[in-house]
């Protein structure tokens, strides 16, 4: 089972986006977002919600709670 930060990185890289691009969407800095993707800082729920809406995936998918629920 993948960690949520690994899934976030894959989602970002699959769309050829930079950490700075996602940080701007979240209203944070690239440095802070980098710490989320490395698993150093925990991702706030408000950011999880924003990213799920942006990527079109469920929170269950990002959190690896169920393999069959990529779509909301």
Residue spans of the language-model regions?
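A short, Lys/Arg-rich alpha-helix, primarily the initiator
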Residues: 1-14
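Short alpha-helical DNA-recognition segment
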Residues: 16-35
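Residue-level detection of the helix-turn-helix DNA-binding "recognition helix"
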Residues: 13, 27, 38-40, 67
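DNA major-groove recognition helix of helix-turn-helix/homeodomain DNA-binding modules
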Residues: 27, 47-61
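Short, basic-rich loop-to-helix N-cap that marks the start of a DNA-contacting helix
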Residues: 40-50, 69-71
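Short, charged recognition helix plus adjacent turn
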Residues: 11-14, 53, 63-72
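Residues that mark the N-terminal boundary/hinge immediately upstream of a DNA-recognition element
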Residues: 7, 18, 44-47, 58
